Amino acid sequence: MKKMQEPIEDPLSKLTQYSGKTFVIKYGGSIMKNKKAEEAFIKDVKYLRKLGINIVIVHGGGPEISRWLELSGIESRFVDGLRVTDEKVIEIVQMVLSGKINKKLSLQFNIDGVNAVGLSGVDNKLIEATKKYVYKGNETIDIGYVGKVTKVNSEFIKELLKGGQVPVIAPIGCDNKGNVYNINADYAAAFISSALDAEKLIILTDVEGVYRNINDPQSIIHEIDIKDVNYYIKEEIIKGGMIPKVQCCASAIENGTKNVQLIDGRNDHCLINDILNYRGTIISYRSGVKCQKAI
């Protein structure tokens, strides 16, 4: 059980510097299972909006997709962390992400006084995509209706932000032929963040950040310059499922995002507390941000 935290008192002086800026937040499916953390997250977003910070949310939903596939008698299969998505699976993916999670989350925001609009990437061609393949040596693996983002309708998002809305986006993409694709939420959030030249991309995870040694809580790396990402991967400091996550964060910075922060979404009021205290792992071009150890 993660220790719950109270929001830091009077954070206004630190957060007002971001007024008028845009934060893109990736809200993971594994975090949604923590009801108290979800409630605190919604309140944090409400507070940031009151300060004039533009918020865009891209949500996942992997655990819920797996649950509905199991209920439908369909086995969940993955290749390099990507869900194999055939015609039956993509129907369930759309149902869960666009019809269930997206609408529930946007409804919760509106109930709590946040003007939010739930969207799928197919709405107004918000997320355009093309079919993604996995390559292993000389082998090309077809994983079905899994897509990679090619274009984001950033003007549409900006208009929503100007209208005071919080776009809540399900990572479903489409192409000009009418195909619909399942897109990794980390990659969708990174692409959207770059398209908006966002001040921050915040990735909510189920760990405190990137560790030198996953078994040592004190070994968290508080800041990574993107020029060091490949070194950390080569040395297997960054490994497993954290590799694509950090790579897409680095790509976001290379394409316009100011910095990326990976924080533990299980902590109560993580969005406020961790931004203020530079907790988690910050990925950026520079090495000038003073980071504190998580407490």
UniProtKB/Swiss-Prot annotation:
Pathway listed: Amino-acid biosynthesis; L-arginine biosynthesis; N(2)-acetyl-L-ornithine from L-glutamate: step 2/4
UniProt site positions, description: Transition state stabilizer: K26, K245
One cellular component term from this protein's GO annotations in UniProt: cytoplasm
E.C. number(s) listed in UniProt: 2.7.2.8
Keywords: Amino-acid biosynthesis, Arginine biosynthesis, ATP-binding, Cytoplasm, Kinase, Nucleotide-binding, Transferase
CDD domains hit by this protein: AAK_NAGK-C (cd04250)
GO BP annotation list: arginine biosynthetic process via ornithine; L-arginine biosynthetic process
Key word Transmembrane helix present: no
Top-level enzyme category: transferase
Disulfide bonding pattern of the chain: none
Main location group: cytoplasm
Compartment(s) of residence: Cytoplasm
Reaction(s) catalysed by this chain's protein: N-acetyl-L-glutamate + ATP = N-acetyl-L-glutamyl 5-phosphate + ADP
UniProt GO MF annotations: acetylglutamate kinase activity; ATP binding
Coiled-coil annotated spans: none
Binding locations of substrate: G61, G62, R83, N182
Keyword rRNA-binding appears in the UniProt entry: no
Protein family (similarity comment): Belongs to the acetylglutamate kinase family. ArgB subfamily.
Role summary: Catalyzes the ATP-dependent phosphorylation of N-acetyl-L-glutamate.
HAMAP family for this protein: ArgB (MF_00082)
Protein name: Acetylglutamate kinase
Species for this entry: Clostridium acetobutylicum (strain ATCC 824 / DSM 792 / JCM 1419 / IAM 19013 / LMG 5710 / NBRC 13948 / NRRL B-527 / VKM B-1787 / 2291 / W)
Protein encoded by which gene: argB
